[in-house]
């Protein structure tokens, strides 16, 4: 090993990088050592610099020129020590080594164990002695080491102990001739020690050097017969350690020989054996590392030593002291010789297991997802791979992208496929502005919704209660809008909501049931329970509200209220007088009989329910209806559920927002404040809000605008997502039905509720052959923009409900050849669109069997064809009718009868039991035994 220490190697041993080289050079200057990037140091300089960097012990280095090369440095050291050149040639590492070089012989395993200390260089007079190369000059890289006089005294004591062990060994040698060579080796080692002792005395006045040593792993066993280059790299060891190792080795051998006769035992592991697997760089120091070579032969870790005299400390104390000395300046690495990381191997296993856990996604068993969620959001919440989710939907016949929304059915299917338990949450809850209203709850009026079948007298009954005649103002005498009114009875107010009874207004009835406290089901006593009656009862049951039955038209003759009660009892609504829970009040909207009894029953039910609400704070209301009025813009009918809505308040309702400009009650009077359960018509909206949306009051316009924009963005993305979803079945239908007939329509209505009802009714008319395509719908009048949307379509039509186009729009419609149709009754609109669809649909073709004939003989006539001689077995065979030729129960040809003859005469038809001759059009492959089956096609119109 070279006597010079390269700066880069020094940095590597410290665990520092090249980036920290500058700091090391600066620290070297502090102790008087000038270094450069490629400089080398003597072991003494390296030792002092190490103590300064790690321990903070500052020892000044005498000013001298740093060695430019290892050869010059070694020459200076040799001149200082005045060591004779023959010394290195004469003294080798061990006597065994010298003997091996002079006479190479194969060595036994025992000899290798006995010569375990031989790879360690001996110190003679404080100088490291390293084997020389054969036929070469003495190595110049050996740096002389000088030790103190105290070490010489210790060496003498060790020598005496070795002398005693030698005497014991001689006795063993007599009993066992095989150990003679070991004794000779011991004698040679002792002679070498004496020579080293003399050398120590010569140089005892030379200043002792300090240094450091690093223990490294040497996994392969050193062989004494290796070449000199390998031997020159063998580690050195202190004199005291060498003597201690020799003593322990021979003592162990004495014990083994003594026990050999009794019981063979396995030799114990000794520190010497450990030294066989270590590589030591020793710069002589006063420190004694006898018992501190803590090295585990079975681990790959590199151990860092404290460089101080160590007591018998446990591993935890050693690690704590090491961390404190290093002070977080040494990087911890797997093979770093400066850190004792005894648990690295075990920790690496944990890391590998941790990586394996991360590579596999854990599928959750229960997840909470919103009601409408995108594909990638579902994958994230369920901790699934997005590709697996899309692949599963693809295999189920649904092509989606990661941004598409999943409907409830798709979510349930995915939950089954991935074995998940889901809890669906309301999507719009994240958009809700939660505000805790503080205050005292006060009594509020009940909200009563009147529902029932069409033409059962709901609006007429409400008109009688209000002393108004609203039914006469409705087109066709049927209610087509949802209305809200306030009625006072016995100094108490009751809010009534009138819902349409037509089947098209199912969603209106549902909204009315959602905001109501009490449901009044109006049933005509002369008509009984009908379809919309059952639907209204289902809405009330879903809303969990009490139901009161009003048996209307009791003034008519031949009414049967008991029959009506029986029909309701079959549905689960038993009358009170039959032992049930539901009140059946007989009333007459024409005469007014039973009205007071109905109102009193409603108030009693409200008292039982103890309806209360907080009046202070921001308002929360429900939009019952929205429309556009000339001169007022977008307006909405709202009913307040909590808080107070005042003129000037900012609000938002779905995508609409604004500030309350005016409020008008059902009597047309202007009001300033709207308290719970009160209804009014408000203005000041940015657009018509959807019917059934929640209106929420906020602090200012900016908050209202922001909330409305959030909802608009969400609804837009949702609509785009739904438009991109196409199933395989739908694609195949579109390809197969290239002649699918679509009727593009634009629908404009006066109110949002009516518009919604018309759209739903028209979409129900669609079938596999023709369909109505709503390309635009809105509240308000017909504009030129509506005309431009349908101008390029052949069958396009614009439908207006309760609105009239202006003269300019009519002229543009003629120019674009666009049909505009307006209606005031929803019945007429739906029936006309049904007729239009039927006209575009192909008729239904049915077959009618007319006759059957059996072939008895065939005649081939040149230039004419084959004529079949037949007997009519059933019905009548006519000329020009379609016929099937059946052979052995299989239809082989279908065509028309070209010629029909009886004998030589042409006839129009032949009846059952008669013979005839039949010739088919362009077919001559007729055989005896074939059967003719004739039929005619009947075209029938389709119905919707």
Curated annotation (Swiss-Prot):
List the biased-composition ranges (Low complexity): 175-185
Q: What is this protein called?
A: Translation initiation factor IF-2
Q: Family per UniProt?
A: Belongs to the TRAFAC class translation factor GTPase superfamily. Classic translation factor GTPase family. IF-2 subfamily.
- Location in the cell: Cytoplasm
> What is this protein's function per UniProt?
One of the essential components for the initiation of protein synthesis. Protects formylmethionyl-tRNA from spontaneous hydrolysis and promotes its binding to the 30S ribosomal subunits. Also involved in the hydrolysis of GTP during the formation of the 70S ribosomal complex.
Extract the GO molecular function terms from the UniProt entry: GTP binding; GTPase activity; translation initiation factor activity
Q: What PROSITE patterns would the database entry show?
A: G_TR_2, IF2
Q: Where is this region: G1?
A: 452-459
InterPro entries hit by this protein: EF-G-like_DII (IPR053905), IF2_II (IPR044145), IF2_N (IPR006847), P-loop_NTPase (IPR027417), Small_GTP-bd (IPR005225), T_Tr_GTP-bd_dom (IPR000795), TF_IF2_bacterial-like (IPR000178), TIF_IF2 (IPR015760)
List all Polar residues biased stretches.
132-150
In terms of Gene3D superfamilies, this protein maps to:
P-loop containing nucleotide triphosphate hydrolases, Translation factors, Translation initiation factor IF- 2, domain 3
> Which portions of the chain have biased composition (kind: Basic residues)?
204-215
Q: Which GO terms describe its cellular component?
A: cytosol
Identify the stretch(es) annotated as G5.
Answer: 588-590
Q: Which UniProt keywords apply?
A: Cytoplasm, GTP-binding, Initiation factor, Nucleotide-binding, Protein biosynthesis
Q: Where is this region: G3?
A: 498-501
